[in-house]
């Protein structure tokens, strides 16, 4: 029993020990550390290998500060369980704390550093160890901090420690330099500790002796940095510290400003910075006052808010700094952003404090803007111990401030700049949104987001997805709207509970608490990080999940948990924002997103009728029950939703659907939209209304407009609450109604403007409009402008006032009448207009605004003929600015353009009748503009506007319509009247030479100088201070074209060599329509650089094909002129959305249909005499022998010229031939068929030698007509005479590649120099500067195109450095070798280093075409060790690079030159004929070049001496064949050569061996030896531009013939013959013996000669391809000639129909409507136009000659 009892007790004792660990934990929690240590030791006696117990025991020893035992316990626990990494750091900290110097601490710190790289704790431990080592440790610590900062530049603690290290060692200058360098870091600028360190360092530096010894500029620069640091520190202190600390810092800021104030002088950086910091000081003072009031009562709030308002007024009125005084772009940007931030915050706080308080700011300024108010402000901010007189605040002059309330437009502009200063902080954006939430205008969130996210699309087509890649600007805008909405509701709830009447709803930005939730902030930060690609490696997946989860909520997808009130708020805000946008695409996107949210709300509204919406637990946007939708509001919201649906239909152009939807809704909003739609329809019909049914339809639309406007007024009278729903003020509705009533009154039967079936001819006389054919803009501000029929009262008062001012000052005073005119404009808060193409006349912004006549569209002074609407494409008006009329004449500016209100009597040209006009002066004023409107107040019967009297009057060259009433009076009584003279010249001219006819786009009366003219002020002249240079008109080549389509795309080009698509550029792809010939073309320029990357005609044979794998891309084949010459390219355009791609396809096909309908605009006939067919026949013979074609090019040119001259003498037929002129610099033919031009001397039968190739504007000479009215024949006769002149135009084609009459397949290079004409340049070019590349004294040993890569250690990846020619160059003097590589086009260095003996090339794993090496590279100007890799396209090129590289190392050691290597696959250069031309004729050339035999080889060899060694050609012309396959006929061409030194296949050669004969040519006096006879770098032969790929057959054939040759061409002057003979079947006998070295050298030279021959063979292939391409172009020209004949016949048929219609119509308006068509097509002279106008009016009978 005793033994069993003992065993039982022992087991119990053991179990108690095992439980000791748990007892120890309990005692530890009870803070009984001794008992805990006792029990854990008891436990360890049983379980000694438990690492948890050892660790717990170490913790207990650590609490007792027994470091040694604690370290030992931790070490034992780590041995038992090694994964406990934190114990390593714990041991290191304990040993460093105990100042252990036996090396253990260093060991454990280094061990911990490996486990925790970059840990701040490790840094502190290392710093502690190095501090203990004295001066040596200081140096090590400095080096270590520098290396750590290179890896982690944003580490605040490490930056501060480095600056403190400098300061402790009295290296204050280095400390200041470090502070200045780190100021660019945004992370450091937002740290309070760092800014405190900077302020202390700069203050210490200014007070030190070092600063006193330095120059004055250094002191001023340091003071500038100190002020900037104070402003930043003050902002951070207000945000994070208490009031007392903020007051102390503000007082220190005050002292710094006072210190700098005494040193101000002149315009320098310190003065500009001081002025800006003064504004920040007062702004921060106002924020501090409001922060002090947070814990005060109502009385204290009143006093503090008034003082804060004073501070904000001063801060807002400090002007923006002159940033040009700041050195460096970074400093300028910083000061500019700080100024915008100050003005934004101060301006918003002024509006915030004065809201609801009338004259609040005025009372504040009157009360406190004096000495006593300054004392009150000083006492409120600073302590009473400081001296007021020595402070900046106490001594500043604040008595001259004004009461100036911020303008909303200015605030919106400042907000955009302030967003950059805060780096897109969500707190700042929310604060700005809250400020705008209480203002009548909408916040510019769209502009804010565009500023932050430049490349983000505005809307996505995939609203149903939640992928982070689909996020767009509208998603972020909706998010910000939601954050501002919920934050505003939260502030309102807080203010309702406890809020002082003087406390602003939203405190200043540094003072207010967080305005967004943590979830909202984390989502916003995640979005910004992903978009700007700043995610930490490994963290991107987590951020994507955060963004993806909330996108569902923002797009109201399933289970979104949004409050219906928030959805309604989003829908209304987006609709309102969309109405204010100008672009129709933007409108569609905004209103489309609004419709999306309305569709999500409507089902919820039905649920609300039954019960309430459940609230989620943790929503992204908090629900507020105060804005819950009530059942009584549901009907109103449903009505708003359907109105938005109808607006979207209207924006999309579905007008009928929109009208139907609006008519079903009985609301003032729908009435207003219906009135806008019908009024717009009436305007569109009114512009072209000719027939009575059209006029009746116009009246019906106006009646509907009137009825809807009356309904709005009636509803508003009965219920005033409906006025709030109107999108415009009620006054605008009444004004529009008044205008419509006036228009209806004008339509009344027998009215003064409705006679002879003419609809308001007085207005339409010089009024023209091109209505938008597809869409209606619903913006009354943009679409509906009107003018009262009589001048308003304010206009008369304004004129008298302006005259009085002009008499007093005797100078021209510019007056801005925009405010006066604002009540006659439609309000701007409505739908924005659709985007319209060029040429669609926009509205002017003021009555009587001078209007610029655009060259891209129909002039507003022409009335478009309704009978020839689709054909009216000829001759755009000259770029003329009309002169201005007197203010007595009433101008009307409407959507249609420019009109003049006249009386029923119409216009009267010439001298008016004496009895009807008061004689004001004997002659017009000298500076009077051409439009002279007389005062009609004293007239008995108003006769309208009087024209004439001087040459400065209107000359209506192309206007042929008559006015109503009396019609035209041609001024027969006036001998000075010249009728329609000067056709095609400027419509409005002025006698005053200095009177610049500038366009007044502002629509003001700024330039209406006539009312300000007095007799005393006529001779006033102001000399400009700085003479401006002559204005140079920018010519883009698109002047005579109309933009039919424009969209941003990414363009690609298919590279046939590598069979890949290559990106060509990003930009706007345009479809332009030529106003002269009606042909459309496609043009695209790259963004920013504006380089043309696509420029070609659109033809009926082009087909759009979808790119495989994408529904957003189209590809097509076209003859492109982007590089100046036609080149067959396969292009592809990628659009943002499939909808945009489909729209492009529709517009493209529409242009192709347009080509079928438009007749040729130049009515001449091209006749083919058969000479082109002869050329083609001769060219075809080249397939059987290129020698015939060669002979034709050289010997038959005389015949071609004779035939051409003979053909030109046959009249019109000869003049219309295609001319081929030989170029004296080019043996190939230059074909000229793209410069047909109609000349003034076109009646001459000879072909003119020069012509002006220009747009047919009014400035060009008057052209003779083809169909001519013979002056000697009475009646109406036709005589047909030649008027065609085909000539070479000396003017260059415009850069966009457009030329009138050029066929789309034309590919001919033209040279204007051969005409012998010289044109003085408009802008003289600077002197030619010789370009030095640094490679002048070096020979190119190796050169080939390659792709270079650089290894980036930070990311551990290879990064592409550039694509270009990599060269190995050797210096002639010191024999040093280096590698140089420049990028294509930009020519920037991407590799530049020496080849050293220790360098070695190694193959990259996985490929044999890539070489890797390490070098000290100088590409960026500084020495930098780089790991480089180069990749070649072909393996043999890579091998040759390695070979030359190794030879270079050997050559440097031996101090010898390297034998150059000529790349057989040189970098391809641009070809004038295009690479596609070679590919088209590949089969033909292959037949002639695959095998070389017999005499062909001999002829080929004879060309070697003639070949040029030039690597570049200066002329982009087609070279003749250098190497022709043939026999004896070719030898005659080169018969001038003295000898054939290298002949193949000549069996008759004396002493020949293998048929080879070698003769060294003598050196001539005037030329060098042949390139084959040269050595070194001079023996290179570069293939020409049209180069084919290598032909292995040729290489093998030629190499085999010269493989065993050991003879070369020596350089001696005497002729030495080396002959080798070999009997049949016997070995060769040598008649001359050579040493081994000579044989090796000569064999090498012979091999190089064979390589050169290979190059010539390839060049010959390319030349043959050029000739075949010319054949193709000749064929295309014949097709074009035939097509022109057909078009000319159709054009003549059309003209015949027009003339017959003219003859058989009755005299009057119907005949007159055909006058512009006949005038344009027949090119009538002024006299003929006058006769034709008389016939149209019935004043002269039409006589048709009878047939004999």
Curated annotation (Swiss-Prot):
One of its GO terms (biological process) is NLS-bearing protein import into nucleus. The modification Phosphothreonine is found at residue 14. Keywords: Phosphoprotein, Repeat, TPR repeat. Residues 1302-1314 have a biased composition (Acidic residues). Residues 751-796, 1198-1233, 1291-1316, 1565-1606 are annotated as: Disordered. Residues 1579-1602 have a biased composition (Basic and acidic residues). The keyword Metal-binding does not apply. Residues 1021-1157, 1318-1454 form the RanBD1 domain. One of its GO terms (cellular component) is nuclear pore. Residues 769-788 have a biased composition (Low complexity). The keyword Membrane does not apply. Coiled coil: none annotated. Pfam families: GRIP, Rab_bind, Ran_BP1, TPR_2. TPR repeats lie at residues 51-84, 575-608, 639-672. It comes from the Eukaryota. Residues 1685-1735 form the GRIP domain. One of the 8 copies of RANBP2 clustered close to the chromosome 2 centromere. This is RANBP2-like and GRIP domain-containing protein 1.
């Amino acid at each position: 029993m005793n033994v069993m009892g003992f065993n039982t007790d022992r087991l119990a004792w053991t179990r108690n020990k095992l439980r000791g660990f748990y007892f120890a934990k309990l005692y530890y929690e009870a803070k009984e550390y001794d008992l805990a240590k006792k029990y854990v030791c008891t436990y360890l006696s049983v379980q000694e290998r438990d690492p948890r117990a050892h660790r717990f025991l170490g913790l207990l020893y650590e609490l007792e500060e027994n470091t040694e035992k604690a370290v030992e316990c931790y070490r034992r626990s780590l041995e038992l369980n090694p994964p406990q990494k934190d114990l390593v750091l714990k041991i290191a900290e304990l040993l460093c704390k105990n100042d252990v110097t036996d090396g253990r601490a260093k060991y454990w710190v280094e061990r911990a550093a490996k486990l925790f790289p970059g840990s701040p704790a490790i840094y502190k431990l290392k710093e502690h160890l190095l501090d203990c080592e004295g001066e040596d440790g200081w140096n090590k610590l400095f080096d270590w901090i520098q290396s750590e900062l290179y890896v982690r530049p944003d580490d605040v603690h490490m930056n501060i420690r480095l600056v403190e290290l400098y300061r402790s060692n009295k290296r204050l200058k280095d400390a200041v330099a470090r502070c200045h360098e780190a100021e660019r870091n945004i992370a450091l600028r937002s740290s309070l500790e760092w800014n405190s360190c900077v302020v202390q360092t700069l203050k210490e530096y200014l007070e030190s002796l070092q600063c006193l010894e330095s120059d004055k500029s250094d002191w001023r620069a340091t003071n500038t940095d100190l002020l900037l640091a104070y402003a930043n520190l003050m902002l951070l202190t207000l945000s994070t510290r208490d009031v007392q600390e903020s007051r102390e810092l503000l007082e220190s800021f005050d002292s710094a400003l006072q210190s700098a104030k005494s040193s101000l002088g002149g315009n320098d950086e310190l003065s500009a910075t001081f002025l800006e910091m003064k504004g920040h000081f007062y702004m921060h003072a106002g924020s501090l006052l409001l922060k002090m009031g947070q814990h005060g009562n109502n009385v204290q709030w009143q006093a503090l808010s008034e003082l804060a308002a004073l501070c904000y007024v001063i801060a807002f009125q400090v002007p923006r700094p002159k940033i040009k005084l700041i050195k460096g772009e970074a400093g300028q940007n910083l000061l500019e952003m700080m100024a915008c931030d100050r003005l934004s915050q101060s301006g918003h706080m002024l509006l915030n404090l004065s809201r609801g308080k009338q004259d609040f700011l005025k009372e504040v300024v009157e009360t406190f803007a004096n000495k006593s108010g300054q004392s009150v402000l000083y006492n409120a901010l600073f302590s009473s111990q400081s001296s007021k007189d020595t402070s900046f605040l106490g001594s500043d002059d604040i008595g001259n401030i004004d009461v100036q309330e911020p303008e909303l437009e200015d605030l919106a502009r400042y907000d955009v700049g302030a967003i950059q200063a805060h780096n897109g902080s969500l707190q700042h954006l929310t604060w700005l949104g809250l400020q705008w939430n209480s203002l009548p205008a909408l916040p510019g969130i769209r502009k804010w987001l565009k500023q932050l996210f430049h490349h983000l699309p505005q809307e996505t087509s995939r609203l149903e997805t939640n992928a982070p890649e689909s996020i767009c600007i509208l998603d972020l805008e909706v998010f910000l709207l939601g954050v501002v909405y919920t934050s505003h509701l939260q502030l309102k709830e807080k203010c309702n509970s406890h809020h002082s009447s003087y406390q602003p709803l939203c405190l200043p930005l540094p003072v207010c608490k967080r305005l967004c939730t943590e979830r909202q902030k984390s989502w916003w930060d995640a979005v910004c990080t992903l978009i700007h690609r700043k995610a930490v490696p490994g963290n991107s997946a987590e951020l994507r999940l955060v963004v993806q989860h909330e996108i569902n909520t923002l797009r109201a997808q399933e289970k979104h948990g949004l409050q219906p009130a928030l959805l309604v708020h989003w829908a209304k805000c987006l609709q309102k924002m969309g109405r204010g946008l100008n672009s129709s695409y933007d409108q569609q996107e905004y209103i489309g997103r609004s419709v999306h949210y309305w569709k999500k709300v409507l089902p919820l509204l039905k649920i609300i009728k039954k019960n309430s919406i459940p609230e989620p637990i943790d929503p992204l946007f908090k629900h507020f029950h105060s804005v819950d939708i009530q059942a009584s509001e549901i009907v109103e919201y449903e009505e708003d939703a359907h109105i938005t649906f109808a607006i979207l239909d209207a924006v999309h152009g579905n007008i009928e659907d929109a009208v139907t939807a609006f008519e079903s809704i009985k609301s003032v909003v729908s009435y207003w939209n219906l009135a806008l739609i019908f009024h717009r329809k009436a305007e569109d019909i009114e512009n072209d209304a000719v027939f009575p049914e059209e006029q009746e339809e116009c009246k019906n639309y106006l009646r509907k407009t009137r009825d809807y406007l009356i309904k709005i007024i009636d509803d508003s009278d009965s219920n005033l609450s409906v006025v709030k729903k109107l999108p415009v003020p009620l006054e605008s509705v009444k004004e529009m109604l008044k205008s419509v009533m006036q228009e209806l009154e004008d339509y009344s039967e027998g009215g003064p403007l409705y006679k002879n079936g003419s609809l308001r001819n007085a207005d339409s006389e010089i009024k023209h409009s091109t209505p938008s054919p597809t869409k209606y803009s619903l913006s009354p501000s943009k679409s509906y402008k009107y003018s009262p029929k009589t001048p308003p009262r304010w206009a008369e008062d304004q004129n008298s006032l302006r005259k009085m001012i002009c008499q007093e000052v005797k100078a021209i005073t510019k007056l801005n009448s925009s405010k006066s005119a604002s009540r006659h404009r439609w309000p701007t808060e409505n739908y924005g207009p659709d985007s319209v193409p060029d040429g669609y006349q926009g509205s002017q912004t003021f009555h009587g605004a001078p209007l610029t006549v655009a060259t891209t569209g129909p002039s507003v002074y022409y009335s478009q003929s309704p009978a020839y609407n689709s054909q009216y494409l000829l001759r755009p008006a000259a770029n003329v600015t009309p002169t201005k009329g007197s203010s007595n004449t009433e101008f009307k500016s409407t959507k249609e353009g420019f009109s003049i209100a006249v009386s029923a009597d119409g216009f009267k040209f010439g001298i008016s009748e004496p009895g009807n006009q008061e004689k004001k002066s004997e002659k017009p004023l000298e500076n009077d503009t051409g439009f002279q409107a007389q005062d009609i107040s004293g007239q008995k019967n108003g006769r309208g506007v009087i024209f004439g009297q001087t040459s400065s009057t209107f000359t209506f060259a192309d206007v042929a319509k008559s006015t109503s009433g009396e019609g035209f009076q041609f001024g027969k009584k006036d001998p000075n009247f010249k009728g329609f003279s000067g056709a095609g010249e400027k419509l409005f001219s002025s006698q005053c030479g200095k009177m610049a006819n500038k366009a007044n786009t502002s629509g003001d009366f700024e330039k209406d100088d006539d009312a300000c003219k007095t007799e005393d002020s006529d001779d006033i002249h102001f000399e400009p201070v700085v003479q401006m240079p002559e204005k140079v008109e920018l010519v883009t080549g698109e002047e005579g074209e109309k933009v039919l389509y424009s969209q941003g795309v990414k363009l690609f080009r298919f590279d046939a060599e590598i069979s890949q698509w290559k990106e060509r550029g990003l930009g706007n792809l345009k479809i332009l329509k030529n106003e002269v010939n009606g042909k459309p073309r496609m043009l695209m320029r790259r963004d920013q650089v504006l380089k043309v990357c696509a420029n070609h005609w659109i033809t009926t044979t082009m087909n759009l094909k979808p790119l495989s794998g994408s529904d957003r891309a189209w590809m097509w084949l076209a003859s492109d002129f982007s590089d100046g010459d036609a080149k067959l390219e396969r292009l592809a355009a990628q659009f943002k959305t499939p909808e945009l791609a489909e729209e492009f396809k529709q517009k493209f096909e529409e242009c192709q249909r347009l080509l079928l309908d438009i007749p040729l605009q130049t009515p001449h006939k091209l006749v083919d005499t058969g000479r082109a067919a002869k050329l083609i026949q001769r060219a075809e013979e080249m397939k059987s022998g290129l020698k015939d074609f060669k002979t034709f090019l050289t010997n038959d040119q005389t015949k071609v010229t004779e035939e051409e001259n003979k053909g030109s003498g046959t009249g019109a037929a000869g003049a219309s031939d295609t001319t081929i002129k030989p170029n004296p610099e080019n043996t190939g033919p230059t074909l000229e068929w793209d410069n047909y031009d109609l000349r003034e001397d076109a009646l001459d039968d000879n072909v003119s030698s020069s012509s002006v190739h220009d747009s047919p504007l009014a400035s060009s000479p008057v052209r003779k007509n083809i169909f001519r009215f013979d002056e000697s024949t009475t009646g109406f006769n036709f005589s047909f005479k030649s008027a065609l002149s085909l000539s070479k135009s000396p003017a260059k084609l415009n850069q966009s590649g457009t030329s009138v009459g050029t066929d789309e397949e034309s590919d001919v290079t033209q040279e204007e120099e051969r005409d012998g004409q010289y044109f003085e340049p408009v802008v003289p070019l600077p002197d030619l500067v010789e370009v030095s590349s640094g490679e002048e004294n070096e020979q190119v040993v190796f050169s080939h195109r390659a792709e270079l890569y650089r290894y980036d250690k930070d990311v551990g990846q290879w990064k592409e450095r550039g694509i270009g020619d990599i060269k190995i160059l050797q210096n002639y003097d010191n024999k040093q070798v280096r590698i140089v590589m420049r990028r294509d086009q930009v020519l920037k260095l991407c590799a530049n280093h020496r080849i050293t003996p220790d360098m070695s090339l190694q193959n990259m794993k996985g490929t044999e075409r890539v070489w890797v090496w390490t070098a000290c590279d100088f590409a960026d100007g500084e020495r930098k060790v780089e790991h480089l890799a180069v990749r070649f396209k072909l393996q043999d090129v890579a091998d040759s690079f390695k070979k030359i590289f190794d030879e270079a190392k050997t050559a440097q050691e031996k101090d010898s030159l390297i034998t150059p290597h000529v790349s057989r696959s040189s970098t391809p250069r641009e070809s004038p004929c295009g690479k596609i031309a070679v590919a088209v004729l590949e089969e033909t050339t292959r037949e002639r070049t695959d095998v070389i035999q017999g005499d062909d080889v001999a002829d080929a060899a004879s060309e070697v001496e003639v070949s040029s060694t030039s690597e570049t050609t200066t002329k982009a012309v087609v070279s003749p064949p250098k190497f022709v396959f043939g026999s004896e006929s070719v030898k005659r061409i080169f018969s001038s050569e003295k000898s054939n030194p290298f002949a193949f296949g000549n069996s008759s050669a004396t002493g020949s061996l293998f048929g080879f004969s070698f003769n060294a040519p003598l050196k001539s006096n005037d030329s060098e030896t042949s390139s084959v006879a040269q050595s070194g770098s001079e023996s290179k032969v570069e293939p020409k531009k049209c180069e084919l790929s290598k032909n292995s057959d040729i290489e093998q054939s030629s190499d085999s013939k010269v493989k065993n040759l050991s003879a070369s061409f020596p350089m001696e002057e005497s002729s030495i013959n080396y002959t080798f003979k070999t009997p049949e079947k016997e070995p060769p006998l040598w008649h001359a013996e050579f040493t081994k070295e000579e044989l090796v050298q000569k064999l090498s030279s012979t091999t190089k000669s064979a390589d050169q021959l290979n190059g010539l063979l390839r060049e010959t292939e390319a030349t043959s391809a050029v000739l075949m391409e010319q054949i193709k172009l000749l064929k295309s020209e014949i097709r074009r000639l035939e097509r022109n004949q057909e078009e000319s016949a159709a054009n003549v048929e059309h003209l015949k129909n027009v003339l017959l219609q003219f003859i058989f119509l009755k005299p009057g308006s119907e005949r007159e409507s055909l006058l512009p068509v006949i005038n344009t097509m027949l090119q009538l002279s002024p006299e003929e136009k006058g006769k034709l106008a008389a016939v149209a009016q019935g004043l002269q009978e039409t006589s048709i000659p009878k047939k004999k």
